[in-house]
């Protein structure tokens, strides 16, 4: 009969593919369960209020039109819905595909069963497939995996969350309209069951059997599979566990499958008492906590509570006398095997000959160890016992008492067993690889000895007092030939023949009285020894390794092992070399990967890589978690070193008087530093002792693990310091900004110095790590803060700064800002608010409008540079850019609302435009014309002024940041600054040349050079924020004249001061000149340059008209508004770095030259 799994056996390949797919689906569900977007949980009140109207459960399907019309009625809800779609469609689609594949899985399995029944596979029926060993295994696995899939989904992704995701996918995806979409079936299968994995949650009635019956499955198939599982040892595991008391462990995998599959036929659990008694007697006579898949544990006492027959059958097992007997038995077993294993692990005990002579004994010890570990770990696990269930608590308490349970001792047994297994496997692999060469070597040696003896008896080779004996000579030659004729490939015949040869050599010694000659005896003894070695060597079989692999299975502890983390970490802290022992435990745990990967591998499925990566990644993450205690302990010592170095140890001067040497010696503190440094290097040594290890398919390099661990701890501490250090009280007078920055600067400096100090002792590049991680923390926080301003937000899993191995912690917001960088930015904006302060450009300083006291100055940015570095300033700059964009967008919507929709305003503007046209002329009766327009539009300017001043304020801050970045770059990185400057000038020259002559080259759209160089230039402060285009704009009617009117409406609130320029006239009605100028300049920069030209022409006309009126009325002084307008033009030209002739085109140059002299 054709091999069931042969590639040309379509029937076998089809079911193998289904099972392979099942394992891959479970891995995908487990992977996705860690990425459920928080909004779908609707846990906190803020999410409920914000998203409650756009995230629906299945009640949506009762009347989709009603819900959609509710959305359409509110434009802001539509906007939010669209934003939510853009941010979540990718992850929701991924979840939907996983749900779809679960449904497809059961559809495929049902189709396969139908094909079998209809004879699609020639000569194959359900019965014949179940007769084949592989077929029987695969059919049982196919149904079992479907059950596991459903249970895992319900455990990891709550029913309500699934419903919300499915509805969201239905609403947002175009796929719903396609004819082949099976959305309805998927929704029916995965609708909420009412089950909750929260502790203390009640189990819904008829759960999980009603859930398992949502898609009907062939009943004959279910009952035949249950029949096979009840009667057969489908995986032939009993051969690996010959002792009857290990029977339930041997059948544990099969028991887990039966447990799951029984829910497909719940009548057995309810009423078939005889069947349930048979099942319990075979599979659960001494155990009731089982692992069903990759460490998911179930307590049968709880799970079978609602089922009469199952509960009755299990009562014998759960009888307190039986519980006591089992717990006591495993207590004595674990005591016995612990001593045995420790004996085996003694240095030098496990040698090759000991191993070869004691294989059965060693394997028995391993079996006992693993069975005891399994029973104790499962039956004492917290996850398997509901603390609210009195009976379960009572059983568990009895186990803990009777087994004298001590988690440290159990963990030690696990460590020793893993180490013992590891050594045994390594030795066996070594022996198997050398098996043939050694066997041939022993054969050659034995044969040569016999040839030499034959020569001795021939009389040719003289040996003391050995007489010539032709018979013996011929006999030894024959034996030599017989030894040479032994064939390695026919091990059975060779073994039998070798035994006969040993007997013959013993007999020849007795019959011919050869004992009298010691040398002949020695030759015979040596040959017998070589023949014995040949028998031993030929008995080294791979079956031993397979048995060790089977009995060493630790997949049941995939999740339970986490409860031992604290014990592992404590033992590492006390003795860092413990890491080498843990390596064997991690490798033992890695063997659990065989379970889900076996079928995927057999099917040559492309899922092999992703599933291996998922489980290997999970295990490596766990290894990292355990070993993180080393960096943690190092940092604890490091903090003590920092404290000693900064507070206790005095800096030794370059010149030192001899009599002061004792004062500077400070032997106590220095000894303490040396001791702590030694402890750090011991920890480093500990982790580096763990060799490079392949965990699943991921190579774990201890040096990399150490570095990642140090980075993780550094990130955790620095992120916390930044979060805690930058929380401000907005009511504090004066602001806490500078003191907090100084304090944080000292903390960061401490971290930095300690990192420099430690790098040589742990063999890492301290400065490189420091810069990479601090920049990552700051950039990530800036990204999170900027998400506030983005419609399509960057999720953590999309962020280039966030990492799974070295995660940047997130902290709950303490105010409207999400992160420390937002709080810092808003505090700076608060204290430099143009309504409260006056900015003096020549001094780069802000003063309080009322008290005239200095509020802050450019020193603030030097302090930020010292504390947060270039990354901090650059991040602040980026955040200000986003804020400016938001402010400009708000401004545009306000412009549309106030100016373009108010009829009175429009009429006023029309009248003014007709009065001022043409712009080259002089407006007759100008003061009246302008005053009338200002008066009619007075109410719109307050909101306008606020927006313009905010933009101007942020532009001043950006200028200050650029100056600070540029000066620090020129000091600290002269060559970089010069190179960037040159490259920038060269690029600009090339671009200008292209515009003069289009045949010259120009960077194409797909060329990222300009984007990349811009990032560098902004980080080095080589840019002018005033030239930046922040938003794209359309043509706006009346735009130049509105801005002109706004400006002349503000001029009466200001006055000219010879020393300070334009300052606020009344503190009660504050207007700050620099933010006003820069705000207007920035706003105009966003539009076509002709708007700016019109705006400047209007100001020029205003100055000329006012001057004309003033001279005609023979007023001796220049009007204040004209001075203000002239100063605006002057500042405009200065800030934009334009030539003066731009202003002189609208105002005669002699007025510019002379106006200050008449003030």
Curated annotation (Swiss-Prot):
InterPro entries on file: WASH_strumpellin
Subcellular location: Cytoplasm, Cytosol; Endoplasmic reticulum; Early endosome
A cellular component term, taken from the record's GO annotations: cytosol
Primary residence: cytoplasm
GO MF assignments: identical protein binding
Keyword match ATP-binding: no
GO terms for biological process, alphabetical: cholesterol homeostasis; endosomal transport; endosome fission; exocytosis; lysosome organization; meiotic spindle assembly; oocyte maturation; phagocytosis
The keyword Cytoplasm belongs to this UniProt entry's keyword annotation: yes
UniProt keywords, alphabetically: Cytoplasm, Endoplasmic reticulum, Endosome, Protein transport, Transport
Pfam families, A to Z: Strumpellin
Role description: Acts as a component of the WASH core complex that functions as a nucleation-promoting factor (NPF) at the surface of endosomes, where it recruits and activates the Arp2/3 complex to induce actin polymerization, playing a key role in the fission of tubules that serve as transport intermediates during endosome sorting. May be involved in axonal outgrowth. Involved in cellular localization of ADRB2. Involved in cellular trafficking of BLOC-1 complex cargos such as ATP7A and VAMP7. Involved in cytokinesis and following polar body extrusion during oocyte meiotic maturation.
Family per similarity comment: Belongs to the strumpellin family.
Self-association and partners: Component of the WASH core complex also described as WASH regulatory complex (SHRC) composed of WASH (WASHC1, WASH2P or WASH3P), WASHC2 (WASHC2A or WASHC2C), WASHC3, WASHC4 and WASHC5. The WASH core complex associates via WASHC2 with the F-actin-capping protein dimer (formed by CAPZA1, CAPZA2 or CAPZA3 and CAPZB) in a transient or substoichiometric manner which was initially described as WASH complex. Interacts with VCP, PI4K2A.
Protein name: WASH complex subunit 5
Source organism of the structure: Mus musculus
